[in-house]
Regions:
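Detector for methionine-enriched segments
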Residues: 1, 54-57, 103, 115
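Short, intrinsically disordered low-complexity segments
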Residues: 4, 29-31, 44, 63, ...
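Mixed-charge, Lys/Arg-enriched low-complexity segments
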Residues: 66-129
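Amphipathic alpha-helical segments
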Residues: 2-17
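Amphipathic, interaction-prone secondary-structure segments
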Residues: 13-68
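Generic structural signal for short, solvent-exposed loop/turn connectors between secondary structure elements
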Residues: 1-2, 89
């Protein structure tokens, strides 16, 4: 699965800013079908999910928007999902990880709560000012 190959790349390149958790996604029934990255400096989480060999791999960037207030359980969150085809060639996986880091550093461009977008649409968001 793409997620397992991407996980190997991420493990080789994590630093003190990134915490890494590998787990089972509740809807997949497959082991290690979700990876959660927490970028401490940016206060942003990224969830990577692939539930089968033939399903798309989804990368969801999640960030807190606004501060927690009384009666507000955890604050307000914004997110955006980006999908990749399961046929993506392995040679592009290091670029996917770099893409994730770019998304985190430009998180404000990705919060719409809309349906998942393709990586091509996400690249367009990154390149638009």
């Amino acid at each position: 699965m793409l997620i397992h190959k991407l996980t190997k790349i991420i493990k080789q390149d994590t630093d003190d800013n990134i915490s890494f958790v590998e787990c089972d996604h509740p809807f997949s029934g497959r082991p290690r079908s979700q990876v959660i990255l927490t970028f401490k400096e940016q206060k942003t989480r990224v969830s990577i999910v692939q539930i089968s060999d033939m399903s798309k791999m989804y990368i969801c960037i999640i960030s807190r928007k606004g501060k927690k207030t009384d009666g507000d359980f955890g604050g307000h969150y914004e997110w955006q999902e980006v999908w990749f085809k399961p046929t993506l060639e392995d040679k592009y996986l290091p670029q996917v990880y770099q893409f994730i880091k770019l998304m985190v550093n430009n998180a404000n461009k990705f919060y719409s709560k809309s349906m998942a977008i393709s990586y091509k649409e996400a690249i367009a968001k990154l390149t638009n000012k």
